Amino acid sequence: MANSTSTQILVEGPRNVVVKFEGVLDTSDLSSTTVLDPTTLSAIDNAPGTLPSRLRIDKIIHNVEDTLSLNLFWDATTPVRIEEITGRGKQEYKDIGGLKNNAGTWSGGTFTPAAGFTGKITATTQGWAASGVLSFSVTLYCVKQV
């Protein structure tokens, strides 16, 4: 058998999107894999007809098997780590304005994307061991952004 991953959009509205990303690893650690691509989503409510180019993460719910860690990244030529996720739990970021895509720079309220910026959220894992089968499940609550 080979590693398998699945991505399921649980909710997609004009502002919010909730995605569940799961994986079963029996061959190796997960190499960079797209979790969510904002350009594949529907238009944003506060900018009619405008497709999102970035996402903000407001909440993460996760269940990652012991010894395994799941790393989330903002995609760019040099990916920017969002968070390393281990164990089981829930992180809420809405009270601090969410986790914003910082694969670029902000100046005077204007965002300038880094080289190779795609807006995607990607994932990798660390900790898989030979002859083992490890799994993870993560649910991301996101807000679409231009």
Name each region found by the language model:
Residues M1-G49:
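Solvent-exposed, flexible loop/coil segments flanking beta-strands in beta-rich domains
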Residues V19, I57, L70-L72, I82, ...:
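Hydrophobic beta-strand residues in large extracellular and virion-surface proteins
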Residues L25-T33, L68-L70, V80, Q126-S137:
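Short, surface-exposed beta-strand/loop "edge" segments at domain boundaries and coil↔beta transitions
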Residues D37-F73:
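Beta-rich globular "head" domains
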Residues D66-T86:
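Short, surface-exposed beta-strand/strand-loop-strand elements in extracellular ectodomains
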Residues A103-S135:
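Noncatalytic modules at the cell exterior or secretory-pathway interfaces
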